[in-house]
């Protein structure tokens, strides 16, 4: 079985999402199905069919999260030190052309979220900076074209 790297924070978020689906969302969907069933003829009961569709979606999401959690390997980022980019590192990058500064945390596919500044280790930026050190220049192939960045800092912190 393949193991998928994930930070402790990411693992906890997935567990919380699963718990909410199992304890709150699923029971309410099951109740909606039962209530719609009481309305009579199921062949023409739009409420029933909609509730069943929602139930299937929720059950699928629960199975997906259970599988993700079973395949997850929690990496304790707080144990890492140094100036080399590793999984879980927060990396400060300077665009060599525009001089703009970006900070990203390198995380697993299960927890990447660009809005939170978390990018996947398998993304173009993640691949380009992995195992590089502070001060190194990296060229990254992005959809918008090649960009050159300097690694200004590497930090390991457990959020």
Swiss-Prot record:
The keyword Transport does not apply. GO terms for biological process: DNA-templated transcription elongation; regulation of DNA-templated transcription elongation. The keyword ATP-binding does not apply. Keywords: Coiled coil, DNA-binding, Transcription, Transcription regulation. Pfam families: GreA_GreB, GreA_GreB_N. Residues 45-67 form a coiled coil. One of its GO terms (molecular function) is RNA polymerase binding. HAMAP family: GreA_GreB (MF_00105). Belongs to the GreA/GreB family. NCBIfam families: greA, PRK00226.1-2, PRK00226.1-4, PRK00226.1-5. Necessary for efficient RNA polymerase transcription elongation past template-encoded arresting sites. The arresting sites in DNA have the property of trapping a certain fraction of elongating RNA polymerases that pass through, resulting in locked ternary complexes. Cleavage of the nascent transcript by cleavage factors such as GreA or GreB allows the resumption of elongation from the new 3'terminus. GreA releases sequences of 2 to 3 nucleotides. This is Transcription elongation factor GreA. It comes from Neorickettsia sennetsu (strain ATCC VR-367 / Miyayama).
């Amino acid at each position: 079985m393949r193991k998928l790297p994930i930070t402790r924070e990411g693992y906890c978020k997935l567990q919380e999402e699963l718990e909410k689906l199992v304890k709150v969302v699923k029971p309410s969907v099951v109740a909606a199905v039962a209530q719609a069933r009481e309305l009579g003829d199921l062949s023409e009961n739009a409420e029933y069919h909609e509730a069943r569709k929602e139930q299937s979606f929720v059950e699928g999401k629960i199975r997906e999260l259970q599988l993700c959690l079973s395949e997850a390997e929690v990496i304790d980022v707080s144990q890492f030190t140094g100036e080399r980019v590793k999984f879980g590192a927060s990396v400060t990058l300077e665009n060599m052309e525009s001089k703009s500064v970006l900070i990203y945390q390198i995380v697993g596919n299960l927890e990447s979220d660009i809005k939170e500044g978390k990018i996947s280790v398998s993304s173009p930026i993640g691949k380009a900076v992995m195992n590089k050190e502070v001060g190194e220049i990296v060229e990254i192939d992005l959809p918008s074209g090649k960009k050159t960045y300097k690694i200004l800092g590497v930090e390991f912190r457990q959020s």
